[in-house]
A protein has these predicted regions:
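Helix-turn-helix
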Residues: 2, 6, 10-44, 48
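Phosphate/oxyanion-binding loops and surfaces in catalytic or ligand/nucleic-acid-binding neighborhoods
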Residues: 52, 56, 83, 87, ...
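Amphipathic alpha-helical linker/stalk segments
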Residues: 49-76, 116-122
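Hydrophobic/aromatic-rich alpha-helical bundle segments in the mid-to-C-terminal region
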Residues: 123-177
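Hydrophobic alpha-helical connector segments
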Residues: 61-90, 126-141
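Alpha-helical DNA-contacting segments of helix-turn-helix folds
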Residues: 45-53, 105-108
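Amphipathic alpha-helical packing segments from all-alpha helical-bundle domains
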Residues: 57-62, 101-128, 135-136, 169-177
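Amphipathic alpha-helical segments used for helix-helix packing
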Residues: 84-106, 152-158
Length: 186
């Protein structure tokens, strides 16, 4: 826990540029040997932090019936958006994930994909909608909101929407809900 807290704090304060095994060891008070033993590398430690804080890897949404399915989907996307908006470390970690490709990142992506496909299967089974349709809409919503949350750290306005303020995100979420309502109304 101390290592994960330390890595999160270091990412907030310094970004990834100054994160190395020596700096993490010094700041956390945990020996390099223990870091290597439990995480194999600095990337392994960062991946453990992502696994602990990632929305999709820690979601437990179950869609049990068609009546509750749509409200649950809306809640799921709302929680995803709010998590991204309120967790600057997670946004930085997603940027890091996009900038490299290794076995640790591949494993994280595979785990996230399994969770996503499970959710898609549940929605398809309950709604009778084609898998391609649900998967594409989910990809569009998830990718676009993730991108906008990451962009909001550097660019306050996108397509005239103020993405570094609550009102802009209320507008975005409202249209996510409208998309979902249109899809499931047919």
């Amino acid at each position: 826990k101390r290592l994960l807290d330390t890595i999160g704090q270091m990412i907030i304060e310094q970004g990834f540029e100054k994160i190395g095994i020596n700096a993490v060891s010094a700041q956390s008070g945990v020996s390099k040997i223990l870091i290597y033993r439990y995480f194999n590398s600095i990337d392994g430690l960062i991946a453990a932090y992502i696994r602990k804080h990632d929305f999709w890897l820690n979601t437990s949404f179950e869609f049990s019936d068609t009546v509750q399915m749509l409200p649950a989907i809306k809640e799921m996307f709302y929680k995803h958006i709010e998590r991204l908006r309120t967790d600057p470390v997670l946004r930085k970690l997603y940027r890091w994930e996009l900038s490299c490709n290794n076995d640790i990142i591949a494993s994280l992506r595979e785990q996230r994909e399994k969770v996503g496909m499970n959710l898609i299967e549940q929605v398809c089974t309950l709604s009778g909608r084609p898998k391609q349709e649900i998967a594409a809409l989910s990809a569009i919503i998830t990718a676009s909101t993730t991108y906008l949350a990451m962009l909001g750290d550097y660019c306050p306005v996108f397509n005239g929407i103020i993405i570094d303020e609550d009102n802009g995100w209320k507008q975005i979420y409202k249209e996510v809900v409208n998309l979902l309502d249109i899809l499931f109304a047919n």
